[in-house]
Amino acid sequence: MRRINTIMQGKTNGGNGPESGTVVVTRTQPKTRKPSLYRVLLLNDDYTPMEFVVHVLQRFFQKNLDDATRIMLHVHNHGVGECGVFTYEVAETKVSQVMDFARQNQHPLQCVMEKK
């Protein structure tokens, strides 16, 4: 936070008593930072079906069929692919949802997050 001091001179209550003189008013201005962003990544494996990966991308990352297919092929060909960029809490939730869903469907799909 940044502090700003404002000095005001004058008389209060119109007299020469203890109420007259200089008044210092301190105001603080909050300094906000943008939150750190995290990439959510899918990792390739030899067992998870491509259709399941596309379904995950559509369900948890709201990707259309073309984008989901493109990302899935990138994961397949390069070993890793980015699903999206989110704040820490959102990225953590997405990773957890994907991992739970993969386990429920008995697939070894791995999803991780890394700071951008």
From Swiss-Prot:
Region of interest: Disordered: 1-23
Any one biological process term the GO annotation gives: protein catabolic process
Coiled coil: none
Alphabetical list of SUPFAM superfamilies matching this protein: ClpS-like
Composition skew (Polar residues), residue ranges: 1-11
InterPro entries: ClpS, ClpS_core, Ribosomal_bL12_C/ClpS-like
HAMAP family per the UniProt record, alphabetical: ClpS (MF_00302)
Family classification: Belongs to the ClpS family.
Entry-linked NCBIfam families: PRK00033.1-2, PRK00033.1-5
Assembly behavior: Binds to the N-terminal domain of the chaperone ClpA.
Known function: Involved in the modulation of the specificity of the ClpAP-mediated ATP-dependent protein degradation.
Protein name: ATP-dependent Clp protease adapter protein ClpS
Species this protein is from: Brucella canis (strain ATCC 23365 / NCTC 10854 / RM-666)
Gene from which this protein is expressed: clpS
